[in-house]
């Protein structure tokens, strides 16, 4: 019985220490939350450019596909 109490007390002690370390880390992260690093700014700019390029690419493909389809339908209907 004594060893069981000792083990439980030891586990409680370890849990308390790990919890306090996590809280310290969390508070340190919250302190830095207001500032953006250069890497975060670059990542944000690159993501924006990537999304823009995807949108332009889709528009180009869509326009090209419509052009090809209209040409093919014109040739099939022999109205060109």
Curated annotation (Swiss-Prot):
<dbReference type="InterPro" id="IPR018247">
    <property type="entry name" value="EF_Hand_1_Ca_BS"/>
</dbReference>
<keyword id="KW-0165">Cleavage on pair of basic residues</keyword>
<dbReference type="InterPro" id="IPR012521">
    <property type="entry name" value="Antimicrobial_frog_2"/>
</dbReference>
<protein>
    <recommendedName>
        <fullName>Gaegurin-4</fullName>
    </recommendedName>
</protein>
<feature type="signal peptide">
    <location>
        <begin position="1"/>
        <end position="22"/>
    </location>
</feature>
<dbReference type="Pfam" id="PF03032">
    <property type="entry name" value="FSAP_sig_propep"/>
</dbReference>
<dbReference type="Pfam" id="PF08023">
    <property type="entry name" value="Antimicrobial_2"/>
</dbReference>
<keyword id="KW-0044">Antibiotic</keyword>
<keyword id="KW-0964">Secreted</keyword>
<comment type="function">
    <text>Has a non-hemolytic activity. Has a broad spectrum of activity against both Gram-positive and Gram-negative bacteria, fungi and protozoa.</text>
</comment>
<comment type="similarity">
    <text>Belongs to the frog skin active peptide (FSAP) family. Brevinin subfamily.</text>
</comment>
<keyword id="KW-0732">Signal</keyword>
<dbReference type="GO" id="GO:0042742">
    <property type="term" value="P:defense response to bacterium"/>
</dbReference>
<keyword id="KW-0929">Antimicrobial</keyword>
<keyword id="KW-0878">Amphibian defense peptide</keyword>
<feature type="disulfide bond">
    <location>
        <begin position="74"/>
        <end position="80"/>
    </location>
</feature>
<feature type="propeptide">
    <location>
        <begin position="23"/>
        <end position="43"/>
    </location>
</feature>
<dbReference type="GO" id="GO:0005576">
    <property type="term" value="C:extracellular region"/>
</dbReference>
<comment type="subunit">
    <text>Monomer.</text>
</comment>
<keyword id="KW-1015">Disulfide bond</keyword>
<dbReference type="InterPro" id="IPR004275">
    <property type="entry name" value="Frog_antimicrobial_propeptide"/>
</dbReference>
